[in-house]
Amino acid sequence: MRWKRMMQLLDVHCEGEIGKVAIGGVPKIPGDTVADQLHWLNTDPKGRELRHFLVLEPRGAPIGSVNLLLPAKDSRADAAFIILQPDQAHASSGSNSICVTTALLESGMIEMQEPETVVMLETAAGLVKAVAQCRDGHCDSVTLTMVPSFVHELDAQIATESWGEIRFDLAYGGVFYALVDVRQLGLTIEPGNARRLVEAGMLLKGEINQRIQVVHPDIPAISGVAYVMFRDEDPDGAVRTCTTMWPGRVDRSPCGTGNSANLATLHARGRVKPGDSFLSRSIIGSQFTVGLQGLTTVAGRSAVIPTITGRGFTYGIHQVALDAFDPLGGGFVLTDVWGAAAETIKI
């Protein structure tokens, strides 16, 4: 076989959201820091080529992420990783952190200790502490101490043709989110509304990014609203969430970074205090436990330290390869499954 590139992927999902983990064949990524490596993947043609190799057809699909496992830059970390999605490489993700932790332990790359194993993960957004509950060689659950999360703006407003004036919060939880109370759109978060929520989320994200500029004060490589997360409250008090993602799909998990950003807004409004915890449910009913571990500051701004607890499950392992003579090897997309956003991808 005439393969010029080959990588091994462990198939993992966290509460329904796919987060494949590249455990072998990952090339060296240039950069002195993980943030530098993130920047390279998003700006260098070779970085874009690597991302397209993994996330576009014929090897990829619009759903899920691929996590590149990398050597840690920080001596305190056990491993580093960067999240690859069709739109770009991303700095941080709660569900993907749980997938990576599960992969590291269940593959034996990091020795599993029972009943508890601590894994330090390095992301472009900072260190994430993962505490895995382990039993009989299985990773039962993972609790993440997320990066400090903060509010950029509460009750921002944007005028829309479809829904009139929409209020939203801008907050950071590892990436920037626009957090929208879903009932403003006349919708509820349930599986039957997934397509309508996606269409609304993608429209709002585009309009917000055109009008508002957000940049992390300490990490310039993290800028712009990455996702719109719709939120609601279930009758039992659980937070119901739906994060909308490029090219036009919903997060199957409750979303760790989105809940971290939302936690910052809840604290800013006086609705939670250190030591509090609550359930967050996704559009398919899967759950995270969200906790407020403590308070801190980021560049002089008040910030919260969130915890997220969820489960990861391995479901397969496979290899992907590139035939040097394959005319479609660089990847391709079509609007039938990728939607109109397919036309914006530069192959």
Swiss-Prot record:
Gene3D superfamilies documented for this protein: Diaminopimelate Epimerase, Chain A, domain 1
Assigned keywords, A-Z: Isomerase
EC number from the UniProt entry: 5.1.1.8
Residues the record marks as active site: 93, 255
A matching Pfam family: Pro_racemase
Keyword Endoplasmic reticulum: no
Keyword Transcription in annotation: no
A Gene Ontology molecular function term of the record: trans-L-3-hydroxyproline dehydratase activity
Catalytic activity entry: trans-4-hydroxy-L-proline = cis-4-hydroxy-D-proline
InterPro entries, sorted: Pro_racemase_fam
Annotated residues for binding of substrate: 85, 94-95, 251, 256-257
Annotated family: Belongs to the proline racemase family.
Task of the protein: Catalyzes the epimerization of trans-4-hydroxy-L-proline (t4LHyp) to cis-4-hydroxy-D-proline (c4DHyp). May be involved in a degradation pathway of t4LHyp. Can also catalyze the epimerization of trans-3-hydroxy-L-proline (t3LHyp) to cis-3-hydroxy-D-proline (c3DHyp) in vitro. Displays no proline racemase activity.
PANTHER family: BIFUNCTIONAL TRANS-3-HYDROXY-L-PROLINE DEHYDRATASE_2-EPIMERASE (PTHR33442:SF5), TRANS-3-HYDROXY-L-PROLINE DEHYDRATASE (PTHR33442)
Protein name: 4-hydroxyproline 2-epimerase
Species assigned in the record: Allorhizobium ampelinum (strain ATCC BAA-846 / DSM 112012 / S4)
